[in-house]
């Protein structure tokens, strides 16, 4: 019989499909198993409606057979099968799906889920095969038919000899090449692992005869050398029932923990398990996990976020990044949905309304679980925060604060009050009477923040100080701007304003009286500071650095640490303590030794920078200046 040409621009489509659509050749097995499952679904559904088959779910199966000698991989099902016309229509026209037609005809009825919404999955077999033979017999038909093809040239359909309804697909696996080791698809271990990965939750048993060995009876004992014999045993490769579809009462915490550790390669139990399912505009089940600790590569560019995505129990994407916002990228888990729109390959999802709906609901669910943990299990939440708090704070700052309102109440900060982190709400709730701002300081550690000269004035007032020790912290607070109408105030910014009206008046008078001194020091530090002024925030320290404008000293350090970026310098102000003995020395130098005043100004400036955590440009020069006045 002459070969028939494929329809629907077959050569172009098949070439595109084999070489472009699928990025991993191994998914051919997933596609063929899904097709077999669809065929069984159709027969089961027909029997359910018409009561004609006399078959129950227990009667159905999918079988895989491997033959290394003939280099064939065979997949057999006892599903609905196909007539000659169905073989011609479904396999002769690329991108036509019998499953899609069946689904459309029955979409208003309650019944089984049909996976294969596009008729291209079958042709993925040609990625690994030099020839494909399909033997099929429709349920209730008296004759069988065989469809066979070697690829782009075309196909032929001839009478077949298959007994019993169903379909048998035999692939002749290609020879190995320089880059492709096709023989892997003839190895039982490799094939069983692919089934486990992609098709573990197909609802029908996927069986394969496994070659095994055992100790020969009468050997290995009484001084006899052990001898082994080979035997074959048929095994079911898939678990069939997804753990996320089982009732909560049927699943123990231990089961979920073990599933997580096996599935996501963690040696620790998860910190939190989140189970959720929704019906309606987007129907899905999700099983999510918050790890106990961050992966080694979590805060690197190499880390890939995403949830496993299943369509009716079939894995179609290992890491679907679109299901998680960046702020919750630490979450691991999976989503299973019947409603996702698939494009021509199950590997590449259309960014459609369904996916966005699911992602939005998952985001709210995760945020709700974190809030619940914060309120009801503070110790566990603080454990979570140690691993992933940085990501939440990045989430507040990211995208110009798009998610700041959803995340601000999840944030924790260390403070001057004890060794436990506090929320912004807790800080505001215990603010002192008359306190109008939320005060914070920045440094490499809590101890460094508390040692800042300006912190003394806050302690004297009894005000709590938030201690920001991560690079992103101040950027996050700048995006928030305020919390419960209380503005955030960096204690190292100019104009801390902790003085009484009487103290302010005295400061004005002192500034006027020592105007010449301040101008001389400002000239001595020209190009380094914008201004030298008297401070009302210093107690025991002689001087400190404050900043004016949008860029603080801490932000300057962070921005300048980034590669390939133009250097930025904050507008610095040197503030002097008029009540410190050093100030009297400065006043004397201004009158008696103006040239020495420049040296003192540079030393005070360098000292203030060091206290603020800023590295000196020339430490050796600073040390020499310091020694010269000792």
Give residue ranges: language-model regions.
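GHKL (Bergerat-fold) ATPase N-terminal catalytic module, capturing the glycine-rich phosphate-binding loop
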Residues: 1-188, 193, 216
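GHKL/Bergerat-fold ATPase module in large chromosome/replication-associated machines
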Residues: 114, 135-154, 174-630
């Amino acid at each position: 019989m002459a070969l028939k040409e494929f329809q629907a621009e077959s050569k172009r489509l098949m070439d595109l499909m084999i070489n472009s659509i699928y990025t991993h050749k191994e998914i051919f097995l997933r596609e063929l198993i899904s097709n077999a499952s669809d065929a069984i679904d159709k027969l089961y559904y027909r029997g359910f409606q018409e009561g004609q088959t006399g078959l129950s779910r227990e009667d159905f199966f999918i079988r895989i057979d491997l033959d290394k000698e003939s280099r064939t991989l065979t997949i057999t099902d006892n599903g609905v099968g196909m007539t000659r016309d169905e073989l011609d229509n479904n396999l002769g026209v690329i991108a036509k799906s019998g499953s899609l037609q069946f689904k459309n005809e029955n979409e208003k009825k309650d019944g089984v889920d049909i996976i294969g919404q596009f008729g291209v999955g079958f042709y993925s077999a040609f990625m690994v095969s030099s020839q494909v033979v399909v033997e099929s017999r429709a349920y209730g038909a008296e004759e069988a038919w065989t469809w066979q093809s070697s690829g782009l040239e075309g196909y032929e359909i001839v009478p077949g000899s298959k007994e019993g309804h169903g379909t048998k697909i035999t692939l002749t696996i290609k020879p190995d090449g320089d880059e492709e080791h096709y023989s892997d698809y003839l190895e039982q271990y490799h094939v069983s692992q692919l089934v486990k990965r992609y098709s573990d939750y197909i609802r029908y048993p996927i069986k394969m005869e496994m070659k095994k060995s055992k100790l020969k009876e009468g050997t290995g004992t009484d001084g006899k050398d052990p001898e082994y014999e080979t035997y074959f045993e048929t095994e079911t490769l898939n678990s069939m029932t997804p753990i996320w579809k089982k009732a909560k009462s049927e699943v123990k915490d231990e089961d979920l923990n073990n599933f997580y550790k096996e599935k996501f390669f963690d040696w620790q139990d998860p910190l939190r398990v989140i189970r959720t399912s929704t019906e309606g505009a987007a129907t899905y089940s999700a099983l999510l996990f918050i790890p106990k600790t961050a992966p080694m590569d979590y805060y690197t560019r190499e880390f890939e976020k995403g949830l496993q995505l299943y369509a009716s129990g079939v894995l179609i994407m290992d890491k679907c990044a679109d299901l998680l916002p960046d702020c919750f990228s630490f979450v691991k888990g999976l989503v299973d949905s019947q409603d996702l729109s698939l494009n021509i390959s199950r590997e590449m999802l259309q960014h459609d309304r369904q996916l966005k709906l699911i992602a939005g609901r998952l985001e709210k669910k995760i945020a709700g679980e974190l809030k619940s943990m914060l309120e009801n299990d503070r110790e566990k939440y603080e454990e979570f925060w140690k691993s992933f708090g940085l990501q939440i704070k990045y989430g507040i700052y990211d995208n110009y604060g798009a998610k700041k309102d959803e995340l601000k109440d999840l944030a924790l900060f260390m403070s001057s009050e004890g060794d436990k982190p506090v929320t912004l709400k807790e800080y505001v709730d215990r603010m002192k009477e008359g306190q109008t701002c939320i005060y914070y300081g920045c440094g490499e550690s809590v101890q460094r923040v508390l040692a800042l000269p300006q912190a003394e004035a806050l302690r004297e007032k009894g005000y709590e100080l938030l201690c920001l020790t991560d690079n992103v912290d101040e950027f996050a607070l700048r995006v928030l701007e305020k919390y419960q109408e209380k503005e955030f105030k960096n204690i190292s910014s100019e104009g801390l304003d902790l003085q009484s009206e009487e103290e302010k008046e005295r400061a004005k008078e002192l500034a006027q009286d020592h105007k010449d001194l301040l101008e001389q020091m400002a000239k001595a530090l020209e190009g380094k500071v914008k201004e030298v002024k008297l401070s009302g925030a210093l107690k025991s320290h002689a001087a400190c650095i404050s900043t004016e404008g949008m860029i603080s000293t801490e932000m300057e350090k962070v921005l300048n640490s980034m590669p390939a970026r133009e250097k930025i310098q904050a507008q610095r102000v040197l503030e002097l303590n008029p009540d410190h003995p050093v100030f009297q020395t400065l006043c004397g130098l201004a009158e008696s030794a103006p040239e020495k005043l420049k040296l003192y100004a540079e030393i005070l400036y360098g000292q203030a920078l060091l206290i603020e955590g800023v590295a000196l440009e020339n430490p050796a020069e600073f040390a020499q200046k310091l020694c010269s006045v000792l």
